[in-house]
Every structure is written in C-alpha cells, then in structure tokens.
C-alpha cells in the first residue's frame, strides 16, 4: 500500500551526455586516463609513465617532416594472392575487408620530404594492417624506398612495427627478407646512411632482415623486439627468461641497439644523425 506520492522529484538531474568516442585513452602500461588532446601534444605517449602508443605512418610523417609537408609514393601497390590462400576466410577477402573498414591499403607507407631542411626518405610500417606483416607488397615498397633514397641522394629511415612475415603469402613473404636486405647494400655502396627505428612490436622476419641492418639501430622505449615471442621461447627451452628480455632496454644493454629515443626527441635525433652521416 502506497502511503504518499512525491509531487515533484527532490533531485533534478540533467540528461546524460554521451562522451565523444575516442576522447579519452587508457594507458596500457599504467592505466592512466589520458585526454586525446593531451596525447597529441605529447606525441601519443603517456605523460605519467612514458608508454608509447602505436601510431600510424602518417603520424610519423607529420612528426618528422618540416611543416607536415611530404610526398607519398608507391601508394598504388596492392596485395595479390599467389597461393589462393584460405583460412577462416579467403586472403584477398580479408585484405579487402580491412581496406574497406580502415581505408588503409597496405602495411607500409613511403614518403619523402625535408627534415630540418634536409631531404629524407621514410618507409613506415603499420601494425593496424594484418599486424604490420611483410608480404610481397611491403617488401617491394621498402625496396623502392631504397631506390628513391638513391635517386634523391638522401638518407633512408625505415620504421618497423610488425609481427613478422605474412604467412598467407608463404614463401613469397619469406623472399622479402632476402630482397630487402640485398637492396639495402645499394645504399651502402652509395655511402648513404640507413637508419632503422624499431617500435613496438618488431618481431619475426622483420627483425631477422632489414630492421637490424641499420647503420644506426634505434628503438622507442620498452619496444618488444625479437624473433620468436617470449612465451614461445620459454615453452621451448623450459627456462624462465631474464627480466626485460626482448625489450629495447635489454637489447641496448647487450649491444643490439645504438640508441633508445623518446618519440618527442625522434626528429631531433634523426636530424643530428643526418648532419653527422649524410653526404
């Protein structure tokens, strides 16, 4: 039995306003909530712990090239399906779906422009496209980036962000390891520097080919760099791995890297290296 009925609500609430999608990001490392504008101002790194979020090739281009002015090249290349590969879906259907949903056309973008007034060629990988895996198109793009650097008499920077070779292309993907490594010798013959920047993650056939062949090997902080993943290694050798194994700091300590560079310092460091090594 209801004894009384409130005539008017005692507490007034405003209608809930939905938060704009993507306005707040959560740091995967420390859990801090970061506003999108704060992230952009800090080059997509956490202001609390320094964690580096994965970013697209275009964000690296904007960071590196003067006035965000650059020219992209070889963007018309598309993946083929030499094996007619099918797992849960056809390989070409998978590629088509990713292109439709994301607008990305491959796991690598090439561009050239000026960094502090000096010409620079950049080939940047994108983990958001099939894990940044290297198939025949990615290998060809990196090879053509080498050719462009030679044509422009400019240094080459390759930014790795990949899980390894693209297994859906079988031996064609593995061939790219030898192809990219061999093409880089042309840069060496022309005495043009090759800078390799490894970001999280740089794994598998990428590490085993061009990523470790830089005249200067650089990494972002705490990037995972290796061939097989730590879990696979641990399960194979039946031993615990050293703390920080396969992280950038561990590799720097053991001589596999030359520099670890915070993203906000990346352009400054690349320009400094160009000044020292470029013709």
From Swiss-Prot:
InterPro entries: AcCoA_carboxyl_beta, Acetyl_CoA_COase_Trfase_b_su, ClpP/crotonase-like_dom_sf, COA_CT_N, Znf-ACC. The keyword Transport does not apply. One of its GO terms (molecular function) is carboxyl- or carbamoyltransferase activity. One of its GO terms (biological process) is malonyl-CoA biosynthetic process. Its cofactor is Zn(2+). Pathway: Lipid metabolism; malonyl-CoA biosynthesis; malonyl-CoA from acetyl-CoA: step 1/1. Zn(2+) binds at residues 27, 30, 46, 49. Gene3D superfamilies: 2-enoyl-CoA Hydratase, Chain A, domain 1 (3.90.226.10). It is found in: Cytoplasm. Component of the acetyl coenzyme A carboxylase (ACC) complex. Biotin carboxylase (BC) catalyzes the carboxylation of biotin on its carrier protein (BCCP) and then the CO(2) group is transferred by the transcarboxylase to acetyl-CoA to form malonyl-CoA. This is Acetyl-coenzyme A carboxylase carboxyl transferase subunit beta. It comes from Chlorobium phaeobacteroides (strain DSM 266 / SMG 266 / 2430). The lineage of its organism: Bacteria, Pseudomonadati, Chlorobiota, Chlorobiia, Chlorobiales.
